[in-house]
Regions:
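Charged, amphipathic alpha-helical coiled-coil/dimerization segments
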Residues: 69-132, 136
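Short capping segments at the starts of secondary-structure elements
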Residues: 45-49
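N-terminal leader segment of winged-helix/HTH proteins
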Residues: 1-29, 145
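The alpha-helix within a helix-turn-helix
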Residues: 54
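Short alpha-helical "packing" element that flanks the helix-turn-helix/winged-helix DNA-binding module
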Residues: 38-39
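Key DNA-contact positions within bacterial/archaeal DNA-binding proteins
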Residues: 62
Length: 150
């Protein structure tokens, strides 16, 4: 009886290797690529609660709190209390955070170029489209602005 190999293994291995490559590129900066993703999300959707960000990124509130604390210590985000519910902290990018994000976007473009160099332009486009569909199907994708009470 032959064992059927799962098709997902090469994808998981490739994703892990790509993430390691990005981590190496981001080591030149003072933020990690996942922190840059948070800055990018805040740029796209505007100020959001820490809880909303944790849910979107699929991490615990504690993990998101640690990430936000580090970004805040670097001067890249600021926290403010929600005027409608003082228990909620609203996180937003600072000008320094936007500048930091813009300085590391080249690393994501390097990742895109690496995939394109391996797969070719046409297959890379298909891959990125399929990866986006997969991400959305798994509950990911670009975040939407948070709906909060006023």
């Amino acid at each position: 009886m032959t064992r059927q190999r799962a098709h997902i293994h090469p994808f998981l291995h490739a994703a892990s290797n790509l993430e390691k490559h990005l981590e190496t590129l981001f080591a030149e900066s003072n933020i990690r690529h996942r922190q840059a993703l948070v800055l990018d999300a805040l740029r796209a959707i505007g100020a959001s609660s820490q809880q909303y960000l944790a849910k979107h990124f699929g991490v615990s509130a504690g993990t998101m709190s640690s990430m936000i604390s580090r970004l805040e210590a670097l001067g890249y985000v600021q926290r403010e209390r929600d005027v409608s519910d003082r228990r909620i902290e609203i996180i937003s990018n600072t000008a320094a955070g936007i500048a930091a994000l813009e300085s590391v976007e080249k690393y994501w473009l390097d990742g895109d170029a690496m995939v394109e160099n391996i797969l070719g332009t046409e297959d890379a486009e298909k891959f990125f489209t399929l990866a986006d569909e997969l991400s959305k199907g798994l509950g990911g994708g670009r975040p939407k602005p948070e709906k909060r009470g006023t």
